[in-house]
Structures are given as C-alpha cells and as structure tokens.
Amino acid sequence: MSLPTSLRWLLLPLLALPIANGSSAPVAPAPARPATTADQPASTPAAASLPVAVASDPALPASTTPSPVQPQSWRGQAWPWQRASSFADLGRRQDVMLSGVRNAATYEFQVRRDRLARDAELDLSFTPSPALLPTLSHLRVFLNDALMDVVPISDSQLGKPVQAKVALDARLIGDFNQLRLEFVGHYTDICEEPTHSSLWVNVASSSVVRLGGQPLAMQDDLANFPLPFFDPRDSARLELPVVFASTPSLQQQRAAAVMASYFGSMAGWWRQARFPVSFDTLPEKGHAVVFGVNGKFPSIIAGHAAVQGPVIELTSLPSDPERKLLLVLGRNDADLQTAVAAMAAGNALFRGSVVKVDEVKSLAPRKPYDAPNWMRTDRAVRFADLLDYPQQLRVQGVSPQPITLNLNLPPDLFIWRNQGIPLNLRYRYTPPFNSDESRLGVSINDQFISSFPLIKRTGKQGLEEIRLPVMGSDAGSGDGSLLIPALKIGNRNQLRFDFNFASVMGSAQRDHCQTTLPPNLQAAIEEDSTIDFSGFHHYIGLPDLSAFALSGFPFTRMADLSETVVLVPPQANAAQIGMLLNAVGGLGVQSGYPAYGLRLSDDWKQAVNLDADLLVLGTLPESLRGSDQLSLLIDNQRSTLLNGRVPSPQTAVADARQGSSAADAPINRVAVTADAPFAAIIGMQSPNHPQRSIVSLAAAQSSDYALLDDALTDIGKRAAIAGSVSILRTSGIHSQFVGEHYYVGSLPWWLLLWYHLADHPALLAVLAMVVVLLAAFLLWRLLRWVSLRRLNPEP
C-alpha cells in the first residue's frame, strides 16, 4: 500500500526516533496514561523527570522482590562522584509498612561538605495492597518538605512488587536531607475507615537513593579540621590511610595509635574506622596522614624543610588538588606525640595551613567509668543527656512512632538480685478520647516492662516513678511473681516508650457516614525524666570476650587507656601496625575519648610486671605458651585447641557470667597444620596481677591480621565474639569458653559470699547450719555466764 507524498514527509521524523527494545530502561508515561508496566513499550528519555512504575508480569517466573534498577540506567551516571544508598543503608534495615493512619515514613541522608550533588534520583520499590482503589491511591514523594512527584498506583500493580523511578531536585540537597514518603490510600469510595486493615503499602528496604555530582577542592585551611579526613555527614566507614617513611619506632607507633583513637572516638559505633598502614607509599586514592621526623621524611615530602618543633600541616597533592595530606612532623618522636595530643585536644585553635604546637599539658586525671560514650553510674542521669538529636522525645499522630533512648553501660555493672533500676518518668500528652484504652508502654531491649493508662488529667501531665526490673542468675525464683526478662548490661541497650491512643476516627457504616478530621495528638517525654544507676557495684566474671568486643572492657574502664599497655612485636610490619591502629581506634569508638594515657611496649618481661591490662598483638610470649589458662596456641601454620563443653557464643556468654568459680575443664586437645588464614582472640588473667586481664589478638601472617581487622570493624561479627576464645576463619567466628573464671572488681564481703555460694545450695546449707550452731553456742555461753553472775554475785 503506497502512501501519499505529503504523508511520507510527515512520518519521516518519526523514523529517526530510537526503537525501544527489551533492554531499554522504563521511563515515565504521559500524565494522562497509567504508569508504564513491564509489558508496555518504554517512552523516550525526555520524560525522565516523571515517576516510572513497573509492575511484575504474573506470567513471568519473577522473584517476589523487585529487581534492583541498574546504576547505569540513570541520568547522573556521568558525574565523577557517585553514591547509591539503600533505605537499609539509611537506617531502615526492615521494610516499612505504611497504613491509613501511620501513612508517612522519613529517611534521612547526608552529603559530605566536599561534595556537590548535581543529580539525584529515587529508585523506589514497594508493594501496594490488592484492595486499594487504583488512581485514587498514590504515593507522594517529598525532599526536604518540597513535593518531588506523585507515584500513582494502577490497577495492574495492585498486590505486586512495583518499581518506580522518581527524579529528585538536586538543588534542594544540602548537608542534611530528609526524604519523606506519604501514602494516600482508598479502598472504597464512600464511608471509609482510616484504620481499615486493607489500607497498606509495603516500602522495601532495597529502595535506593542515587546521587551524582562532583567533588569540591577544599582550601588548605586547618580551621576546617577534621575535614576532609573525617566528615560527620559521611555515613560510610571511616578509612584513613597512615604513611610512615619506614618501620616506625615504638613512640611513633604510639603517636599514630593516639591519633587513631581520636578519629575512632568521632566515628561512632555504627560507622567504625580503619587505618591502613604503608611505608613510604601513598594509597592510590583518598586522603592520608603522613608521619615524619627530621631526616626521615617519606619520599612524598622529601623536599620539605626541617621543622623546629611539633608541626601539623595540611597540604594538597600536586598531581591531584582534591586529595589532602595531613602532615604530622617533628624534630624527634616526642614532638610527634605532642603534635598528636594537640590534634586531639586543641584542634579548636587550628587555623591556616600550618600549626606549630607550643605546649600540651594535662591538668586533671581521668576517673574510672567516665567514658563519654558510657552513662554516668555515680548519679541519676537526665534524659536530656541521652539525646542523639533534637525532638527525640516528642511524637505526634494518631498512631505515633515509639520514642527510643540508647543506654550504653559498663559491662561490669553488678545488678545481681537487685530490686530494679529507678526510673523517674515525666510525660505530657493530648487528652485522648477514650481514657480506658489509651496507654503508655515502657520496654527495654524489646522486652515489655510496664504500661500506664493515659487519662484525662487537668494538667495533661503524668509522673510515674517505677523501677526497671532486672534479674541476675536467679531466674528460677519461686515466689510466683511474674519474671520480666533481664536488662542486658554491657552492649547497647534501648529504652522504648510507646504512646497508644484510642481515638474515634469516623464511621464505617454505609448507611450512616460521618466525616471526622484526624485529631492532632501529641505526646512528649520530659527531658527532666531521670534514670539512676548509682549505688551499683562493679564486679564481673572474666574472661568474657563479648565485654571486650562490644564495650572494649577492661581497657575502656579508664577512658584515656591510662591503665592499658599494648604489647607489639619488635620491628613490626605494616599489617601489624595497622592492627595496632585499628584495635586502639576501636577502643576509641567504644569510649568516645582519645587514648592519651596509652602505653606501648615490645618487651614482654617489662610489660607483664606493670599493674595494667595487657593487649597483646601477634604471637604470644613464650612464658604464656605453657599457661593452664591458654586454650588456643597459634604457631605459624600449626594451631592447637583445647575443646570445651560450650560450643555456642550465646551459652559461652551465659557461662562466663553465671557466677561459678569452678573450672570448665577441656574435653580434648586437637592440633592441626594448615596453610590458610587463621586468627584468634584469647582472654585470660594476668599471671602477676589477679585484678588485671590479658587479651591476645593472635595472628601469624598478614592474611591472619586481615581476619582480625575485619572482625573488629564489623558490628555483626563483633556480636559473635564471646567466651574465653574466639576463632576467626574465612567462614566466620567460632567462640567457646574453656578454663577458669576469675573476677575483677569488688563487692561487700557478705554479698561476695552470698553471690559465690548461690550456685552451691548444699554448701550454702552446710554453711548456714554451721553459722546457726555457732550462734547457738555463743548464745548458750552468754546465757550461762549471765546465770552464773546472777547466782554468784561478786562483792
């Protein structure tokens, strides 16, 4: 069939358009059409600013979860700086269920100060309820309270995994940003009930926020320090390479370790920090810290003039101005330590590209258990001192989110058979409609504690004085009372408050419709509320490697590590020094304070005689290899293990704290030789000081140290470290308890006696009988003496 010539000329421009095929990325439909589905042809990229929704085809054997959108399918891929963060990376590790009442979810993300976002996009994955009305139901996407787009829910998408691409306005992106999703759902056209169970949308944690932009070259000005080496807006793990000219001396290693603890104290528990070490070689990318003394500068700064004292200098690489070097220089090793101390304590005075340190002087010593990251245990603590961000104690809405507070406590806090922890709780709330059904629930570590009715008060304020129940090892109490699970001391505890309001939202009767505006319900916990851990003793059974992995105990008992000695190998290589920096940096993460008082030694005979806790890196000293407490020995490729009766980490932790002083004798001894990465963490008592501990990070080769680095900087793997020995392999971590318990801390004599006899009822009964007989004998003697005095009075 031939076409008229005029019509041919009209159709000719259409032939130049790209032909859509199966590999083309789905993009936005025209506003008048429903969202593009997988079996529909894709439109042109010109409409990329509109959302694209893709529903799974039921005829295809697709998985139940949507496939992630490929990074190369978005328009910002050409920018030199790229970042893709899933909702799980932004703190929402589980899917979020939006409902008719709780219909909004907020995701927060930050951008480094030396990055400029030029393009942004949201790859949204969600599953809508199959009962929703299409078109009327939709999702609104806000960026920093500005509406970005609306994602309609079509009939073909109901009950199926859906992917939608939403363009975000990069001009609105700053240092701190909030991405908010709001669900507008309808299941019928008349007489809706907002709390109906069919109103829901499941937002997947695999949804991704993509950013593209360019790095910004910062000026060489130390007034911005610790930028660009550490930026609190960067949620990624801190990785800060350290460069030495050659094998550093012991004092240079200490200076680098103190610096690592300072950066670790800022990194925080969830971010963690690593410090790769190299000799006279810069890393291929990123910033770095360079240590040097006169006459021994690394080759990258070989032309630098000699310094006349402790100096901290910020400079750029000539070949790449965006990369910065932090030079820590001095005339000798003592100058390096002074410079690092000034970096940690006095960087508020820094300005310019070069800072010369005149003096650093400590004025007051630290006290035990005063780590900034730990709660005070010498007085009641106000909730205001526990806040992580403003407005943390305030919620609003008909079904508000829970209020949470994080409590980080010393692991040796002794709460055995205590009545509870005093909690003075003050709260305010909007008077509910139904007082009989509105309540405030209190939980800790996801374990229910108590609840209080929310009634109509004149002052709209409540005051409750309760005690958080705790249990020790006496879980088998026979008094018939309800046993509430124990507050787990030593790791991160979370106190949660749930305001549950009972409100009348309207009528769902089809013959009697009522329109009711949702009430603006608000609630708040007063910042003057207190929790009191004072009066508790400090006493713990060791070895307990979970206390080391989760709290840095016993080293972090003194926040500045002034009672810690680290034993390092003589002539340590780069992997061993990197392990030192990562370990001490990890202790800074736990305590939140730099290790000003840290001591290093490469002489075991000298270190073991010091009244301090020992952290041993590398191979164990010869004098410890024959110790009865040693349950694992690594000798190059040969390893010897004493197997105990406790194979699981959970039981190992319970056994380490159960209060039994009896030995857990090994069952068998196994020795093998293998050529593969293998490392271990071993805990034991100091041979010369019974109140001191030794923790050994045992490794023989560079690949073994990589296992230790990975375990100590991974939050999930830290949780598996427990007992007296933890074995690290490429397959994971195996922990067990073998050997004897020893105890550090102090208790009153009567409590000490009662605690250690609690697991031995027969011995306790015999002791009680002896005490009764002795008391009866003394009473008999006293009465006999009184009677003799009465019958034979003296003149």
PLM regions: where:
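Solvent-exposed alpha-helical segments and adjacent loops
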Residues: A25-P795
